[in-house]
């Protein structure tokens, strides 16, 4: 048996994913732009490429320290018998990772960094809502990565349903609460543990002492990032009644300043749906 993958092996696996991103970032960001019907590549580089790089490189450079056994205290009786206790961090095995469309690379490659750093192998399933991105990533993975270590599968909901029905050692899903329930139900049939990063409400609250202008500026930037298509994008704002009109005026001014025009504005991200 090969035994547990060494720190060097894990670093090499992660580095191959880093190399894939570097070599294919233009094709990937162009595919994202095509899938969105307009998303400036610079944003995709910042959010998906560099965002993924941060996770990959952090795990790559830190994993050896994380692999060290962690000592624990023993109970009184065991201690008297000379016992020692420790936590030994071992790979789970095979990890299924299902990403979402609004950050199609980051929601796959950031969890992948953790999976590879822990010595696991992984199967990635990009969102079918971004088919061009999924196809480019799958082809890049085929050329660059060992499919026994990291594989990419593409397809629609039926593929995701099949994937989540398999007896993985862990499943990671990013997406809607509705689909998250389906993922958990499928995983439960095989007692597969899951990590779910689901959507929800993201309210903002302005107090009476808030600076209306600066709050409006920050919220306009936050709401316009990726056209509001982020789980942390503010979708509800609580404003003191007496400040409502002042805030609406300030927010409108700030948003108009960011995007004086909509038509043919390459800085505007399109709505995927």
Model region roles, listed by residue range:
Residues 10, 56, 119, 150, ...:
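Residue-level signal for inorganic ion chemistry
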Residues 75-145, 191, 213:
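Conserved small-residue-rich beta-alpha loop and adjacent elements
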Residues 84-85, 152-169:
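A structured beta-alpha segment of the ubiquitous adenosine-cofactor-binding alpha/beta core
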Residues 98, 174, 197-199:
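Short beta-strand segments
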């Amino acid at each position: 048996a090969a035994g547990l993958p060494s720190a060097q092996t894990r670093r090499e696996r992660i580095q191959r994913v880093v190399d894939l991103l570097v070599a294919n970032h233009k094709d990937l960001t162009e595919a994202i732009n095509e899938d969105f019907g307009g998303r400036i590549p610079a944003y995709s580089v910042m959010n998906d490429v560099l965002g993924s790089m941060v996770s990959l490189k952090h795990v790559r450079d830190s994993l050896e320290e994380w692999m060290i056994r962690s000592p624990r205290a023993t109970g009184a009786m065991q201690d008297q018998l000379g016992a020692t206790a420790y936590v030994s961090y071992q790979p789970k095995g095979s990890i299924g990772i299902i990403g979402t469309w609004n950050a199609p690379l980051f929601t796959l490659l950031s969890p992948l960094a953790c999976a590879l750093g822990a010595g696991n192998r992984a199967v990635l399933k990009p969102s079918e809502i971004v088919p061009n991105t999924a196809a480019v990533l799958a082809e890049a993975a085929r050329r660059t990565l060992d499919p026994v270590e990291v594989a990419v599968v593409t397809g629609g909901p039926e593929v995701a349903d099949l994937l989540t029905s398999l007896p993985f050692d862990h499943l990671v899903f990013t997406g809607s609460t509705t689909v998250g329930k389906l993922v958990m139900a499928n995983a439960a049939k095989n007692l597969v543990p899951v990590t779910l990063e689901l959507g929800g409400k993201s309210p903002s609250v302005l107090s009476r002492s808030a600076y209306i202008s600066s709050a409006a500026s920050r919220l306009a930037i936050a709401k316009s990032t990726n056209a509001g298509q982020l789980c942390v994008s503010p979708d509800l704002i609580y404003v003191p009644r007496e400040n409502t009109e002042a805030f609406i005026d300030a927010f409108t001014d700030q948003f108009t300043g960011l995007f004086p025009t909509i038509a043919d504005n390459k800085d505007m991200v399109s709505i995927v749906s």
